[in-house]
């Protein structure tokens, strides 16, 4: 009996991965161990965008990753001074949305730049939820939230 060409074989069917606490912990640990997005995608058998989306949500608190082609520096090459300002604003706990606006970038561009350059740190709430400590990841003050 021949198989129809349009039907996928059993190993072609992709089973969606749902992020539970154990997978999130592993993702964050591997990221802070230096595994890049491509390798994380391979490790978790996911597309790069799925990895970005989860890391950005966990580490930056950004849920919406809608591109905005109307911003002045949409998909343009990052310059050294721009990177310096990005790091400075991030370290001052300025929310990613405000950083993007100030730099003339869209939110996904800023978030991906922070993730790809390993400039992002783990918020204490996320570290606590995932059972991580300073030996596992770099933990700093909560980004994007005011501290008193």
Show the residue positions of the predicted features.
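Intrinsically disordered, low-complexity regulatory regions
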Residues: 1-148
């Amino acid at each position: 009996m021949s198989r129809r060409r349009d039907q996928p074989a059993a190993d072609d069917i992709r089973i969606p991965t749902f992020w539970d606490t154990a997978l999130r912990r592993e993702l964050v640990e591997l990221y802070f161990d230096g595994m890049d997005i491509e390798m994380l995608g391979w490790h978790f058998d996911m597309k790069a965008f799925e990895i970005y989306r989860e890391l950005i949500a966990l580490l930056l608190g950004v849920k919406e990753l809608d591109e905005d082609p109307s911003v002045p520096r949409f998909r343009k090459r990052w310059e050294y001074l721009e990177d310096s300002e990005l790091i400075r604003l991030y370290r001052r706990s300025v929310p990613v949305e405000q950083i993007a606006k100030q730099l003339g970038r869209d939110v996904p561009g800023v978030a991906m730049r922070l993730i790809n350059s390993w400039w992002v740190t783990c918020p204490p709430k996320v570290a606590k939820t995932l059972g991580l400590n300073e030996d596992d990841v770099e933990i700093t003050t909560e980004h994007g939230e005011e501290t008193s």
